């Protein structure tokens, strides 16, 4: 599923917030323009992710089609990404999926894991290194641990979707 309406609404709210911040002198015009450039970059990254997704699915088809349940974990702003990811798994492949902030995940949900569980970890910001350590630990329990990352150190690893953001 591609939900352009939600994406468009989110972009509208972000642009509205930038414009309001500039008009209320919370941000300078230059700061507002810098945020707008980041939003443009985000759109390019989104296109890159969409371009990579079919090959990732093809490479991991057996694992993905055999999922019976999943966790999707993020940190910082990517907690929202994790929540949306969990929702999409429920909508598209009809499996129970929970979204967690990564620290929540390691304080309970990971304890009940078995090798049949699927776990998707999304890095970003200050929590990137922590997510990477948790990814390594999760791989001890299940072969179905996946990492979505912008860290080039992981780009050739199994079960990793590397998204360059330069």
Describe the role of every protein-language-model region.
Residues 1-166:
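A SIS-like phosphosugar-recognition module
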């Amino acid at each position: 599923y591609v939900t352009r309406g939600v994406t468009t609404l989110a972009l509208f709210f972000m642009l509205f917030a930038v414009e309001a911040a500039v008009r209320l002198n919370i941000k300078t015009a230059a700061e507002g323009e810098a945020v707008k450039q980041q939003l443009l970059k985000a759109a390019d990254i989104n296109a890159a992710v969409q371009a990579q997704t079919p090959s990732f699915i093809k490479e991991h088809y057996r694992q993905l089609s055999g999922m019976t349940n999943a966790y999707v974990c993020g940190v910082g702003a990517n907690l929202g990404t994790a929540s949306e990811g969990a929702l999409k798994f429920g909508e598209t492949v009809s499996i129970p999926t929970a979204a967690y902030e990564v620290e929540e995940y390691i304080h309970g949900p990971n304890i009940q894991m078995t090798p049949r569980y699927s776990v998707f970890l999304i890095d970003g910001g200050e929590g990137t290194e922590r997510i990477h350590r948790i990814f390594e630990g999760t791989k001890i329990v299940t072969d179905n641990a996946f990492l979505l990352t912008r860290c080039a150190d992981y780009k050739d690893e199994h079960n990793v979707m590397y998204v360059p953001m330069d």
